[in-house]
């Protein structure tokens, strides 16, 4: 399963671990993804989404109805 946020589209990034001796090895920076259930009052049901912590803040700010409308417009839900 892809580690992608449904709302923001955040994906893993690549970078380096850097030791004290300045040796570099490749690593991945993973997004902080959580499975969350949101109650949608207009539909009278729960919606389960895999979202990043930044997306949780967005949902708190604009509301789940606006976010779901955007997801449906993009064809992701």
From Swiss-Prot:
Region (Disordered): 1-21
Swiss-Prot/TrEMBL GO biological process terms: translation
GO molecular function: structural constituent of ribosome
Entry superkingdom: Bacteria
Keywords, in A-Z order: Ribonucleoprotein, Ribosomal protein
The UniProt record lists the keyword Ribosomal protein: yes
GO cellular component: cytosolic large ribosomal subunit
Family (UniProt): Belongs to the bacterial ribosomal protein bL28 family.
HAMAP family: Ribosomal_bL28 (MF_00373)
NCBIfam families in UniProt: L28
PANTHER family hit by this protein: 39S RIBOSOMAL PROTEIN L28, MITOCHONDRIAL, LARGE RIBOSOMAL SUBUNIT PROTEIN BL28M
Protein name (record): Large ribosomal subunit protein bL28
Species this chain originates from: Chromobacterium violaceum (strain ATCC 12472 / DSM 30191 / JCM 1249 / CCUG 213 / NBRC 12614 / NCIMB 9131 / NCTC 9757 / MK)
Gene it is expressed from: rpmB
């Amino acid at each position: 399963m892809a580690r992608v946020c449904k709302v923001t589209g955040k994906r893993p990034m690549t970078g380096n671990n850097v030791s004290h001796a300045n040796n570099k090895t490749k690593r991945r920076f993973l997004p902080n993804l959580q499975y969350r259930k949101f109650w949608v009052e207009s539909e009278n049901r729960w919606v389960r989404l895999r979202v990043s912590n930044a997306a949780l803040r967005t949902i708190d700010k604009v509301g789940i109805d606006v976010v779901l409308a955007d997801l449906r417009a993009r064809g992701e839900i």
